[in-house]
Every structure is written in C-alpha cells, then in structure tokens.
C-alpha cells in the first residue's frame, strides 16, 4: 500500500515525544508498505538528518516554513476560526507542494500526526485518512490558560475554543482516529470519542536494556522541558513524590 505520512516536524533527531512516535511509526510501516514522508519545518534541517530518514522510508519531502510567512499566517488567522496552532503550520506554498505529492505519488491512505497538519487533507475527501491526535491539544491549552498571566488568558481561552471545534471537525472528516491514552481520549469533546483507538507509546527493548555497572543517578527525568505538562510532572515528582521516598 502507498502511504503518505504528514508531520509538523522532521522526526529526527529523537529529542521530542512526537518525533519519537512518528519515527517508529514510519519505520515500522515502511517494512511492509511504500511510505512517503511529508514533513513541515520552521527551522533549518541538517541534511544528515534527512539522509538518515531516507534509510527508513522510500520517499521524503521537507517543506520549509519561513518565519515571516508564519507571522503573516497567524495575523490572518486572527480573523478566522482556524486555531493558531493549525495556522502556524499551514502555508499556501506548502499546500501546493502537498497537492503535487498527492497527484504524483497517488497515496492509498494518508496518516496525519496532530491536528496541526490536517488542514492539508481537509478537502481531499476522496482519500482514506487516519488522524493520530497523540494528545488532546484543546485540553493542554485549557490547562495553560489556568496558569497563564491574566493578559494572555483571553487569547488562550479563545484558542481553546477554536481547538475544541477544530478537533471535532477533524474527527468527522477522518475515517480513523487514534490517540496515545484513554485519558486523552476522554478529554475529547466529540460525542463519539469512545470510537477513538488508543495506541500507547512503548519502549523499544531491543535498544533500551539494563546495563551492569555503577549507578551514578538514582533517578533521571527526561523529556521536552518546553512542554508545560512535562514541567508539571517533574515539579510534582520533586515536591510530592521524592519527599516520600
């Protein structure tokens, strides 16, 4: 089967959770299918990273999103109902290139990671589609609103409502929906959320295995520390859990 996988980031190197999930998804799918990896990027990409990805899938395209176009897109999004997180990653030149890939590759199925990428396939009704929500972005935005400075709360609250509406819209447009955890599935506002398939993350035991030797750390927390839930987790661990140990 010809599969087109659409990502909002280049999934290498593996320093963020969405990259890790996408990397292993693509590598496993490419073992049995012809995979075209379509990536968006708002920063320069090391050619060696692209070369590495060429070794795990048959085709790859990286479309650069210039900063000035991102700013312009966010300004225009203020006068629409499109969530800013979606507008950030959606640009006309990228959409044109995406449509060219559709025409030339002729995918039999499209897989989008996060609703940030779904605007590209929104009007391709003829294509079977799967959306990996990963987590519920609207719930994350709602939580950020609670702790944000007062002057940012109206903006974040508006983004929360936009995300809820958009997540529900994409739910209906996609043939299949998957998510990482049952908890995140329950945070979706769609009445048919129980139909979302839960596919959790795992650990590659062929790569990660216990090692003998002296231990220099009793505990290590690793993750993207620009991501608010990770910050909350490590603070909870330090303040509430470690004092009990």
Give the label of every model feature segment.
Residues 1-61:
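N-terminal subdomain of nucleotide-sugar transferases
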Residues 8, 40-42, 65, 182, ...:
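Cofactor-binding loop segments of dinucleotide-utilizing enzymes, especially the Rossmann-like FAD-
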Residues 8, 67-84, 88, 129-169, ...:
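Acceptor-binding helix/loop patch of EC 2.4 sugar-transfer enzymes
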Residues 39-100, 104-105:
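A conserved catalytic-core segment of Leloir-type glycosyltransferases
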Residues 43-49, 119-120, 139, 185-188:
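Short, charged/polar "capping" segments at the starts of alpha-helices
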Residues 98-118, 127-130:
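Short N-terminal targeting/anchoring amphipathic segment
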Residues 130, 138, 156-209:
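Donor nucleotide-sugar binding/catalytic pocket of nucleotide-sugar-dependent glycosyltransferases
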Residues 172, 194-245:
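Conserved catalytic-core segment of nucleotide-activated headgroup transferases in glycan assembly
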